Amino acid sequence: MLDSNLLRNEPDAVAEKLARRGFKLDVDKLRALEERRKVLQVNTENLQAERNSRSKSIGQAKARGEDIEPLRLEVNKLGEELDAAKAELDTLLAEIRDIALTIPNLPADEVPVGKDENDNVEVSRWGTPREFDFEIRDHVTLGEMHSGLDFAAAVKLTGSRFVVMKGQIARMHRALSQFMLDLHTEQHGYSENYVPYLVNHDTLYGTGQLPKFAGDLFHTRPLEEEADSSNYALIPTAEVPLTNLVRDEIIDEDQLPIKMTAHTPCFRSEAGSYGRDTRGLIRMHQFDKVEMVQIVRPEDSMAALEEMTGHAEKVLQLLGLPYRKIILCTGDMGFGACKTYDLEVWVPAQNTYREISSCSNVWDFQARRMQARCRSKSDKKTRLVHTLNGSGLAVGRTLVAVMENYQQADGRIEVPEVLRPYMNGLEYIG
């Protein structure tokens, strides 16, 4: 959520920045609502002051032995008018807040202006895509050869965009997540967390999934005996519960940065993705991811973004997977991001790079929703923290990249050296 003072005092400047990312801010409507808010605010305050004054007069009149009934009736009438004014003001403030919740974050000045993914800018590349002297098999074919990927069974159990993994393929999937967690906790300074896979609506508002992206989530219905409680939703990413751990907290600045990681399944409806990536593991309703989250001082967030992106890159480098680093243009960034790097791994069967990590600086956008603040020891003042999140990495897509990049002519899959300790020294699958 953007700073309400910024929206109130600099709507034209805000609108210009939002236009860079393709969002049209209705400045005239905001101004009209703000003018109405001022009128209602003054009216409410005047009524409050008048009622307080008249209430005080009742006591004074009573002390003088005067008839207080006319004053009492007047105070009651003022109270009714005040209640009505407060209700009208609350309704208007709710309307303003509802609008504010739909406004995306402002892009950082250095983010390239563009409309969509075609305007993203490549920053760097690492590694050279392997040249094969045999016909490349995709991960689906390789998985079926080794009885490791069973999409038909998943369709029977659930439906499309799910998978059943078996045997050594399932083991490699587990090995990848363990390797990522160990790297981030032992070398990159993150603390490991186990978090709920179901979260409440306050949590989803905190990180910006609600209200705008309700259709992208899998929602649950309450049990009959809990019908009065709020519904839950399955997490689309561990960013949601991890970041919300600091909701409504005031953190001493000497405790920052807070660096957290978690391995969780992620659940997404993939609304709007009909017909895209229908084969294989690239786009699933359920997939695993190792997430990184940092909570930092405002002045440290841009440096933290570079660091976090480097942590994701290190996973790919140790696995020996060629990738490129992209800075997303204004039109392709996520709703809450002010700056985002994507890492795209080389997928041989598609002869292209595919996204495997997205690392974003969210600035104070989530912190304002969550009321997550930090406090300096020197002056005891509080200010909003900055939050960052990044994939470190998407486990299923990493499995795809390993299977395809490490395939052999006979269909075997070489196990990357860094994964062998997690697979009992196994060198090849098959």
Swiss-Prot record:
The lineage of its organism: Bacteria, Pseudomonadati, Pseudomonadota, Gammaproteobacteria, Enterobacterales. Pathway: Aminoacyl-tRNA biosynthesis; selenocysteinyl-tRNA(Sec) biosynthesis; L-seryl-tRNA(Sec) from L-serine and tRNA(Sec): step 1/1. L-serine binds at T237, A238, E239, E291, S391. Belongs to the class-II aminoacyl-tRNA synthetase family. Type-1 seryl-tRNA synthetase subfamily. This is Serine--tRNA ligase. It comes from Salmonella paratyphi C (strain RKS4594). GO terms for molecular function: ATP binding; serine-tRNA ligase activity. It is found in: Cytoplasm. Its EC number is 6.1.1.11. Homodimer. The tRNA molecule binds across the dimer. Consists of two distinct domains, a catalytic core and a N-terminal extension that is involved in tRNA binding. Its main location: cytoplasm. One of its GO terms (cellular component) is cytoplasm. ATP binds at R268, S269, E270, E355, I356, S357, S358.
